[in-house]
Structures are given as C-alpha cells and as structure tokens.
Amino acid sequence: MKNHTSPAAVAAKTFTNATADAYRPADELLRSLDSRTDGLDEEAIAERLDRDGINEVGHEKPAHWSIQLLRAFRNPFIIVLLVLAVVQLFTDPDDLTGPVIIGVMVSISVLLSFTQEYRSSMAAEKLKAMVRNTATVTRRAEDGHAERIEVPVEELVVGDIVHLGAGDMIPADLRLLAAKDLFISQAILTGESLPVEKAAPNGHVQAVDSSGPLDLPTVCYMGTNVVSGTATAVVLATGARTYLGSLARTLSGERVQTSFDRGISSVSWLLIRFMAVMVPVVFLINGIDKHDWLGAFMFGLSVAVGLTPEMLPLIVTANLGKGAIAMSKRKVVVKRLNAIQNFGAMDVLCTDKTGTLTLDKIVLERHVDLAGEDSDEALEWGYLNSRFQTGLRNLMDKAVLTHRDLEAVASRFRIVDEIPFDFQRRRMSVVVTDGRDEQLLICKGAVEEMLQICTEARTGDVVEPLTDEKRREIRAMTRRLNEDGLRVLVVAVRRDPTGDRAYGVADEAGLTAVGCLAFLDPPKDSAATAIRALNHHGVAVKVITGDNEAVTRKICSEVGLDVTASAQGRDIELLDDDALDAMVEKTTVFAKMSPVQKARVVKALQRRGHTVGFLGDGINDAPALRDADVGISVDTATDIAKESADIILLEKNLMVLEEGVLEGRVTFGNIMKYIKMTASSNFGNVFSVLVASAFLPFLPMMPLQILVQNLLYDLSQLSIPFDRMDEEYLRSPQKWDAGDIGRFMVWIGPVSSVFDITTFWLMWHYFGANSPEHQSLFQSGWFIEGLLSQTLIVHMIRTRRIPFLRSVASAPVLALTSAIMIVGMLIPYSGLGARIGMQPLPGIYFAWLALTLACYCVLTQVMKTIYIRRYGRWL
C-alpha cells in the first residue's frame, strides 16, 4: 500500500504553510522562526538539528542481500515445489532422487533471479548517489559577531540566513528577505523551461492569487536553482518538511502491482488451482482401482510435480535478464527486471515535452514588425538591448545573441545606462549612444506591459499613433504567435537628446513600438520519427507537461503528434475519477499539470485497461513514474525521479524507447511460449493419466519416470529466452490474459491426449504390454512418445505460422530440443533406464512413433488455425 499520507494532502499542507509565510513582514517572520538577520548561533543550530534532523530528502535504499534472496523464494511455484519435495522426502526417505531433482531446479531459478536483481539494484544505487553541495549562510560566531560561511547543505536548519547567487542550487525551502533581479529555474518541479522571477515582499511584489505553492513569488523551493540575480533568504523548512520532501514521502511504501506482476500472479494461481483439483482425482482413482494407497500417493505427488511449471520463475528471469543485457548495449540501465516485459505490453506512453520532444534550448524563432512580417530591424533593436545589459543574461537574451552575429552593429554604440528587469514591470531597458547628439532608450518586455508605455507604432517607414484599435491589432498578431507555441516580447525605442542624467523607470514612457521577438524551444529532429515508430507498433503517445498549452500543442504538431484534445491541470482538478477516466482516452495533451495530477492521469489510463509508460526527469514527475507500469527516466534526472523509475536512459532519446518496446515484446512472447506450452501439455498429460489410471491394472508411468521425463522437458525449455519472434507479433502491444491461457489449455491440451491414448492402444494390443509383468514396456513406450510430443509442441506453439516451413526456431532452440529428443529415445537402452524401470523397445515401435508424431503435428496445426480464426490471437 502507499504511504498513509496522500499526495494531495501533502501538497495542500505545503501550500498552506508556504502561503502563511509568503507575505509576512520580515521582522515578524524572523521572530516566529526564532531567528535574526545576523544569523543563528551554534547552540540554536545544534538544537534544531537534533529536533528536525539533517537537511536531506530520504530515498529508497536497496534491501540487504539476504532480504533480496528471501524474496526470490516468494513465488507460488517455488513454494509448491518445496512443499512437494518435503512431503516426498518424509514419505520415502530412502529415495532422494525426486527431492534432489526438485531442489536443483528450485536452486537454479532462485539463484539466477537473486543474482540479476542484486546486480541491477547495485547499479541503480550508484546512479542515485547524491552530489554533495554547500550553502552560503550568515551565522554568529562564538564572540557574537556575524560571519558569512560555507556549510554543507545537510547542516542547514530552520531560521538560517542563506545568501544566493547565480548558479546556486536552492538548498531548502526559503522565504526571500531581499532580492535583486532574481530568476529561478523551477523546471525540475514544473517542467517549465523558462525561469520565473522571485522577489522579496515589498512595494513591487503584492500578494497574488496563487493556484499552488510554486506560484508564490516570494518563496524558493529546495531543488530549484538560481539562473540570475542575488538574494538573501531565511530557511522555512528542511529535509522531509520541504516541498521536495513532501513529494518524496508520497513515494514511500510498496509499489502498485504492474500488469506484469498481475499477469504472472493470475497465471500462477490458475495453474495451482488446476493442480489442486486434478492431483486428488488421480490419487483417488489409482488408490481405489489398484488398492495400493502408498503407491497411488507417490504417483499423485509425481503428477503434482509434473503439473507444476517449476521452470516458470527461471524462464521469466532468464528472459528478463537477457532483455536487460540487450538494453544495456543501447545505453539503458534496467533497474527492475519486469519493466522489460512492461515495455512490450505498453500501449500508452506519457511523456514530458521539454528535452524529450524538444531540445530543451530556447531559440529565437521569429523577429517581426507590428504587422507580423519578418523584420531585421526588430532583431537589431532586440540584439542591442540584450548585448548591453550588464546583469546575467537570461535564456531569451542568449537566444537573441546567438541567433545572428550583429556585433558589427553593436560596435557602433556604447552603454550609457540601464533600467534592470523587475517583477512588476516585466521589461528591461538599456540606454545607448552612437557618439552623436542623441541617445537611444531600447526596451523589450511582455506584450501588455510594453503596450502600456508605448504611444506610437512603426511599421516600415510609417509611424502612427498607438490607438486602441492599433493595440487590438498588435494583440491579435501576438496571440497568433502564441497559438503557434511562441513566447513573444515586444521591442520599443525612444530617441532622447544627449545628456548626463540618470535614467529610471519613469523614463519608460512615450516609446515607439517597432516589432516583436518570438521564441521557441524547438523540437528534436528524432522526435517525429520516434513517434511514428511508436504509433506503428501500437503505442499511443500523450504529452503531460507543466508547460503551457499553446506551446505544447505547437510542438506536438511539429513532431507529427495529432492532438485530438487538450486539457490543463485546473480542468483535471475539477473532475472526479469517472469523468477523468472518460477524458484521458480522447485527450492527447495535458498542460500545466502538478505532480499529483500527472499521477492521477496515469492511474486513470490504467483503470481504462491500458499498460502505461511514463517518461520524465523532474521531481514533479516522480509520483507518476512510480505509479506507471513502466517508469522511464534519464541519468541526468533528479535523484527522486531516478529512484522512482524502472528504467534509466543514458540518452534522452525516444528512439531507444521503440527498441525497448520491441525487446519487451520478444521477452513477453517467449514467456508466453513457455506458459502456454506447459499449460497445454500438462492439461493433456493429466487427461491421459486419468484415462490410463481408470483402465490399466498398473501405473501408466512410475513416479521416478515422471520426474526424469519432466526434468528432460524442462531442460528443453532453457533455450526459449534465445528464440526469435515473428514480425507480425511485434506490431502490437501484448498483454496478459489468464482467461486466454485457460482457453488455450482446453483447446490444445486434449490434442496430445488423443495420441497418448493411441499409444496406449498400440502398446496394449500391438506390443502386448497388457499386464503388470509387461508394464515396463508400456511405460517405456509412453515415456518416449510423451517426451517427444511435449518437445515438439515447443515448435508448434512458438509461432502462429506453419513451423519449420514458414517460421524456423532459433539455432539454440533447434539444437536443444533435438538433443533432448535424442537423449529421451536412448534412455530405455541405458543403465539409467534400467534403474528407473524401463526396457528397450522393438524397432517397429519407432515407425509407429514417427507416424504418431506426424499426425500429432498436423492435428495441432489444424486446431491452431481454428483457434486463431475464432479468438484472433495465438500467443
């Protein structure tokens, strides 16, 4: 189960706490935190560390190796086999052959599973190693004087006075006391690629109607980072009490079951229930008919072992391990083995936008005049504005400066003054001169704020008053750019006489608007190809992002993702689960989503029967990564995102996901081969045993013969993980269906019984094995026919095509099945055969055997064709 504190409750509590302190006067806030502007002393720091603990966000740690080893035994088939081995050991302590055979198979399966999981967890733990950071704080020394020092982030406490500069990671949840031109990147929390401005509460920053804690302009959150500017702040919360920590707490506890877990569990219990019903029936029939209850009991135990697909854990683990190795060659770390299979079952991939569909790099897409036509003049004015500002340039300034080299233009000017960007104005200005008798004030900023300070508009050589009608035209033009997913800044200028006066905000008036700059985080070249490939293989792609809707829709259209409908986080918040379930089917883009809302969408898709993959790298993605059937992250992701993921990509490339999907389907297909082969063979064998037990005066096969036959058959299955899958099987998602397995058993299982009974008739009537004195001949004949038919079923079931002619198994499968068939035919002629009660067979038997097996293959192919036509699937 999940942690008892719901994500929604944690987020609400974080919002409430942050809001209470966001606009409180600094002196009042410091008093409430028992702090002061010159910092805390050592006694207060020690007391708070003892009270609150170190400033660290807890994360999952791999279980001790002994616990992982015990977990490897937590499989119903393993438990059943161990119980059968113990019962057989106590029933017949003189014969250890049966328990030893069972013990060997259990040991191999458990050790292989444990080894692979342990290695994967160790590799993942290395990826999750946290980087040690420091923070700059003001603290009081022993003599009472304040000093600015560097301390490990883990040693921060509530009330510490922290100093921030460009490039710093926010070390805890902070309330700003003072700030200058402070821009914070919250991308790891929101997915938004552009930084947001933060400021201390003063005349420029008023309380705003925030929809969540991340919208508070006076609060900075642990895990985000400073893009530009400086600030002084006080620590509000540390460690688990931070917003980041609240997300980490929602990730504690056991994970929800994935489709793989649910599928294996349902298949396991289906086969166990079948065994629990059939074994007592076999025991009673033989006990009543032959009056040897001990012999009947031992025979029943052997049948139980034969019905138990003890190789399932081994086959599953080997398949997943092989898939993990194949993925590692593609620069993918598989943290949890069952995620490989879930790749194949995945029919919906939810992905973020930034860095996945896009380059995660702001570029200047267009520079236009006020009519929306391309304009180099707008670019030149924008270039001068970005070039001559003295503060740390933001991403859009860098995009302007790298768009085109206009240094030759800039070299004609020198800086006179500047008016820095601030939160309220949402614009910045520079004043430059070319050395002649005038100065130029060049301003760029947000559309509405710029239109308020402009009185004229220039398009080409035409200058006209900026009337209300003209403002509406400019707004309509910029809105069209917004709808194309572009972020728009307006550029304006004013010519002033040369002078030595200082410029201020009041000078930003009477400007002439000259054009617009439009920015875009461009799509990756590989994104469109990858989306087409995923769609071709039956995987629908949905975008879940913290970015705005217009930008996301534009990017989706450019990468060929058809947006049938879109929704925003505020829309999701108003829906109950039933309404959300209906919405997620037809919605392609989910924008402005919070972490809790992302997880809700994933769960809604799962309730609709989808197997969901989620690709994300931010802290805001962690709950959804954990709840998805397969969580995918990248090695540059936040620690919480990497912990929550099942798979970590060393390159954030959607093409790797297509390869993972195909690898997962191969893995799933090979697992299903074993399950359906075993289930149908076991069903047919039990039916044959029931018929033989009812009519024969002796056991149709000795218990030890059953165990040897079962071991040989199991060995023939070891090559299945190395088999190939037909191309048509890989085209669509493959999911677990326990009902289909039961149906498959009933349809295909009796086919082998038909030829088992034919063999009984031949051995009884043609070869005279019709009395207890000749039972070894009868048992030898059925042993070989049963083993060869079970081994041939590998080739019959592995493909929906005609085996050997239109679909040939891989070399390992051909080699191992052929070897087992040869060994099986030689056993009656060996010392082992004599020891387990078998005898050589006459040569004519093998002619009949060849005819029987040929007819068996033909009838199985006929039943396969009928089954596929009726139910539309095979594996």
What is the role of each PLM region?
Residues 36, 219-227, 342-512, 519, ...:
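Cytosolic catalytic regions of ATP/NTP-dependent phosphoryl-transfer enzymes
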